[in-house]
C-alpha cells in the first residue's frame, strides 16, 4: 500500500513542494527569504483580517476606527502594529530576496523571475493602498501626490486620475475602493506566489555556485524545514521587538494627525521602503519623465536576464562584478536617504547623481564588467 502522503491528490502536491522536494545541498541562508516572505504574507493576511473586522472605510470615521482598534479592541494595538511593521519586514525580505537573485544569477529562470517582478509590483500597490487607510495627513497627501502622477500620461491622464479618485479629489469614494483593493490584492498575490513556486519547481533551485546541482540533491524535509524554522524564529524575534519596543520607529508622526485637505504637511514622503523610488521620481524636473523613471526603476529588473553577458551564472567567483553589486546596494541606500530629505541643495544634486548612477551601474557597468571578466578568464 502506498503512503497517503505520496498518493492523496492534495497531500501529494504539498509533499512534492515542501517534503520530498529535491533541493541543492549547498544553499545558504540567502535562500531562507522565500519561506520568510511566505510567512510574512500569511501573517499580513491574518492580522489584516482582524483589523478589517473593526475598521470602517469612511472618511469621517476611518481615523477614529483605527484609534478605537488601538485603545478598545483586545490586543488591537498588537494586531495593528504587527500589521504595520510586518509590512516593513515584508519589504526588507523582498529586497534581500531580489538582491540574492541578482547576485547569484537566479534571474536566468526567466519565468520565475518575471512573475517575481510582477509580484513586487502587486505588493507595492497593496502597501501603498494600505498606507492610505488610517486616513492621517500622510495617508491623504501621499494618496493625492501618487495618484496625481497618472495625470502625466498623455491624453488620458487627467480623466484616468478622476476615474481612480471617483470624484474631483481624494475623498470617500477613493478610500472605499482603496480598502476594497487592499483587501483583495493579498489573495491575488497568494495565487501569484503559487505560480512563482510552480515555475521554480519546474527548474529546481539555483545555488551559490551557480552550477547544476542535480548530482547532489537532498530532501527539503527535514534539512530545509528546520533551517526555515530557524529563520522564522529570527524574523519573529525582530518583528516582535520592533512591535513591543518601538512600534512607530518606521512610521511618520504626521500620520497621527487626521487628514486635512486644507493643510499640506511640509514634507510629503512615503513609507521608508518606497523612498529609493521616490528619490528617483523627484530627481527628474519633468513630471512625465519622473513617472517613467519611477516605473522603469522597478521594471529594469526584467532586463537582468537580457543584460547578463557573463559566461558564469553566479557572481560568487567574479570579484569585479561583486564590487559593482555592493556599489549598487550602497547607491540604493543613498537614494533611500535622499528620498526622505527635503527638496533643497545639496540633496537635489545628490539625488540626481544617485539616480543616474543607479541606471548606469545596471545598464552599462554590470554587463561590460561581465564581458571584461570573460576576457580576463580567457573565455
UniProtKB/Swiss-Prot annotation:
Residues noted as binding heme b b562 in the record, renumbered to the chain: 83, 182
Stored InterPro entries: Cyt_b/b6_C, Cyt_b/b6_C_sf, Cyt_b/b6_N, Cytb/b6-like_sf, Cytochrome_b, Cytochrome_b_C_euk/bac, Cytochrome_b_N_euk/bac, Di-haem_cyt_TM
Cofactor binding, per record: Binds 2 heme b groups non-covalently.
GO biological process: mitochondrial electron transport, ubiquinol to cytochrome c
Record's keyword terms, sorted: Electron transport, Heme, Iron, Membrane, Metal-binding, Mitochondrion, Mitochondrion inner membrane, Respiratory chain, Transmembrane, Transmembrane helix, Transport, Ubiquinone
Binding positions (a ubiquinone): 201
Residues holding heme b b566: 97, 196
GO cellular component assignments: mitochondrial inner membrane; respiratory chain complex III
SUPFAM superfamilies named among the record's database cross-references: a domain/subunit of cytochrome bc1 complex (Ubiquinol-cytochrome c reductase), Transmembrane di-heme cytochromes
Compartments, as annotated in UniProt: Mitochondrion inner membrane
TM segment ranges: 33-53, 77-98, 113-133, 178-198, 226-246, 288-308, 320-340, 347-367
A GO molecular function held by the record: metal ion binding
Keyword set includes Electron transport: yes
Assembly and interaction partners: The cytochrome bc1 complex contains 11 subunits: 3 respiratory subunits (MT-CYB, CYC1 and UQCRFS1), 2 core proteins (UQCRC1 and UQCRC2) and 6 low-molecular weight proteins (UQCRH/QCR6, UQCRB/QCR7, UQCRQ/QCR8, UQCR10/QCR9, UQCR11/QCR10 and a cleavage product of UQCRFS1). This cytochrome bc1 complex then forms a dimer.
Known role: Component of the ubiquinol-cytochrome c reductase complex (complex III or cytochrome b-c1 complex) that is part of the mitochondrial respiratory chain. The b-c1 complex mediates electron transfer from ubiquinol to cytochrome c. Contributes to the generation of a proton gradient across the mitochondrial membrane that is then used for ATP synthesis.
Sequence similarity: Belongs to the cytochrome b family.
Miscellaneous notes: Heme 1 (or BL or b562) is low-potential and absorbs at about 562 nm, and heme 2 (or BH or b566) is high-potential and absorbs at about 566 nm.
Protein name per its UniProtKB record: Cytochrome b
Gene that specifies this protein: MT-CYB
Amino acid at each position: 500500500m502506498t503512503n497517503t502522503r505520496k498518493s492523496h491528490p492534495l497531500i501529494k502536491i504539498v509533499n512534492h513542494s515542501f517534503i520530498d522536494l529535491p533541493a541543492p545541498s549547498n544553499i545558504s541562508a540567502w535562500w531562507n527569504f522565500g519561506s520568510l516572505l511566505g510567512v510574512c504574507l500569511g501573517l499580513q493576511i491574518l492580522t489584516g483580517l482582524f483589523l478589517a473586522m473593526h475598521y470602517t472605510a469612511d472618511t469621517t470615521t476611518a481615523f477614529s476606527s483605527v484609534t478605537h482598534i488601538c485603545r478598545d479592541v483586545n490586543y488591537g494595538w498588537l494586531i495593528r502594529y504587527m500589521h504595520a511593521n510586518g509590512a516593513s519586514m515584508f519589504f526588507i525580505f523582498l529586497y534581500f530576496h531580489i538582491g540574492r537573485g541578482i547576485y547569484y544569477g537566479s534571474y536566468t529562470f526567466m519565468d520565475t523571475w518575471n512573475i517575481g517582478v510582477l509580484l513586487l509590483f502587486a505588493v507595492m500597490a497593496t502597501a501603498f493602498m494600505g498606507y492610505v487607510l488610517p486616513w492621517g495627513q500622510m495617508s491623504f497627501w501621499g494618496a493625492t501626490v501618487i495618484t496625481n502622477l497618472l495625470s502625466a500620461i498623455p491624453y488620458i491622464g487627467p480623466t484616468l486620475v478622476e476615474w481612480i479618485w471617483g470624484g474631483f479629489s481624494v475623498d470617500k469614494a477613493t478610500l472605499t475602493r482603496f480598502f476594497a483593493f487592499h483587501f483583495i490584492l493579498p489573495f491575488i498575490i497568494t495565487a501569484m506566489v503559487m505560480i512563482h513556486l510552480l515555475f521554480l519547481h519546474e527548474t529546481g533551485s539555483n545555488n551559490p555556485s551557480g552550477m547544476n546541482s542535480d548530482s547532489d540533491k537532498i530532501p527539503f524535509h527535514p534539512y530545509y524545514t528546520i533551517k526555515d524554522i530557524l529563520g522564522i524564529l529570527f524574523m519573529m524575534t525582530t518583528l516582535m521587538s520592533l512591535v513591543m519596543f518601538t512600534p512607530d520607529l518606521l512610521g511618520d508622526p504626521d500620520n497621527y494627525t487626521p487628514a486635512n485637505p486644507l493643510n499640506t504637511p511640509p514634507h510629503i514622503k512615503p513609507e521608508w521602503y518606497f523612498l529609493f523610488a521616490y528619490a528617483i521620481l523627484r530627481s527628474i524636473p519633468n513630471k512625465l519623465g519622473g513617472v517613467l523613471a519611477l516605473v522603469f526603476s522597478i521594471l529594469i529588473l526584467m532586463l537582468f536576464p537580457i543584460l547578463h553577458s557573463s559566461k558564469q551564472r553566479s557572481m560568487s567567483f567574479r570579484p569585479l562584478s561583486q564590487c559593482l553589486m555592493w556599489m549598487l546596494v550602497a547607491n540604493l541606500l543613498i537614494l533611500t536617504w535622499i528620498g526622505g530629505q527635503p527638496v533643497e541643495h545639496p540633496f537635489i544634486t545628490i539625488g540626481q547623481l544617485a539616480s543616474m548612477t543607479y541606471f548606469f551601474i545596471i545598464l552599462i557597468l554590470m554587463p561590460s564588467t561581465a564581458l571584461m571578466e570573460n576576457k580576463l578568464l580567457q573565455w
